[in-house]
């Protein structure tokens, strides 16, 4: 019985340790490590190889969307950020307009709304910067006022 309980505890602890997946994009200038933890998307680390510095974002949103719903009371803006979405899938991404860029696409779904979002990260072999873009879909009419990435 003690052996069974020990096995269950070990399996539980190892399951907790596997809840984060990391995705790395890298070239000679920089590396960006993106992490999905408990189905939430965030940048874990950005490494500037030329300056030999490492940035670990601690209190910034991966993105934010400010919008309103037409017909609602004026000055009724909503703001959603990465914490309001869960990651439903991840796949490698190659931008057809920039074949030299490689990266990942993260599909997200709103936790408490009917919004969906695809976040694209891409890095070309000679770029000293990483590109991030969003594709936002809503099942209701909204007025998108501001996007921060």
Label each region the model flagged.
Residues 104-149:
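Acidic, contiguous internal or C-terminal segments within carbohydrate-active enzymes
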Residues 16-20:
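Sec/Tat signal peptide C-region and signal peptidase I cleavage site
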Residues 4-15:
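Sec-dependent N-terminal signal peptides
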Residues 4-5, 34, 134:
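Residue-level detector of intrinsically disordered/flexible regions characterized by low predicted structural confidence
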Residues 21-107, 111-113, 120:
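Acidic-aromatic substrate-binding/catalytic surfaces of carbohydrate-active enzymes
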Residues 8-9, 38, 138:
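A periodicity- and composition-biased signal for non-globular, repetitive helical segments
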């Amino acid at each position: 019985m003690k052996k069974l309980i020990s096995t269950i505890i070990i399996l539980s602890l190892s399951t907790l340790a596997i809840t984060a997946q990391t995705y790395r994009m890298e070239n000679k200038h920089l590396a960006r490590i993106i992490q999905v933890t408990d189905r939430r998307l965030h940048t874990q680390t950005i490494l500037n190889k030329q300056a030999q510095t490492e940035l670990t974002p601690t209190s910034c949103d991966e993105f934010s969307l400010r919008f309103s719903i037409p017909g609602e009371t004026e000055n009724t803006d909503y703001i959603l950020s990465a914490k309001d979405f869960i990651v439903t899938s991840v796949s490698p991404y190659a931008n057809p307009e920039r074949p030299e860029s490689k990266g990942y696409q993260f599909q997200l779904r709103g936790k408490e709304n009917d919004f969906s979002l695809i976040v694209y990260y891409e890095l070309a072999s000679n770029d000293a910067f990483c590109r991030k873009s969003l594709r936002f879909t809503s099942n209701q009419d909204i007025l998108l006022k501001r996007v921060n990435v």
